[in-house]
Amino acid sequence: MEGSVVVGEMHAAGGVYEIIKLPVKEKRVGIFLSPCGAPAAGGFMEDVNAVTGVENYILFGSCGSLDSEKTKGKYIVVDEAYRDEGLSYHYIPPSDYISVPTWSVTRDFFEKNSIPYVVGKTWTTDAFYRETRSSMNKRKEEGCIAVEMEIAGCQAVAERRGWKLYPFLESGDILDGDEWNIGELGGANHRNRKLFLAIEIAKILEC
């Protein structure tokens, strides 16, 4: 984006990740690419805060669908995440789920702009090769409609530090059929529209 400026760097085993300030009027908005998984994503939240002082994070990306009828063609606004990862337990006391208190802000944005969305729970896991049918069915019974690898951990980091997290997802692969279905995973991973939606959400935040 023209006018963007690199304001910091984070060094990880996979390389150097830039923190980029965007030319957004009247708001201090930046972006960074996070590696997959809660430990890396949550750690980068800590690093970005140390470098920039940022306390509001909009997390967006792809996910697996546990209920393709509910998620097809819609963005997923997460209101709770099942804590099937390790990071969150180092930040807050144990519980099955963690709430996302900002979910209504994201919902209101999609509603106001007539963008298709669904509100629901997600299942955050460290082990994508252990997304078994029995585990999936259990999570579906509890109301989960998606599976991903970051939200529970990142929300725990935000809660511990007194920050705010605004997550939304786009479903890619489909897990609720007879067999795994790649679905729209390629597009969900690479479509730029989520970035531009995140920038618009950033503009309305009180920060």
Labelled PLM ranges:
Residues 64, 123-128, 153, 170-174:
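Glycine-rich beta-alpha junction loops
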Residues 105-113, 157, 197-205:
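Generic non-transmembrane alpha-helical segments
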Residues 152-187:
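Zn-dependent metallopeptidase/amidohydrolase metal-coordination segment
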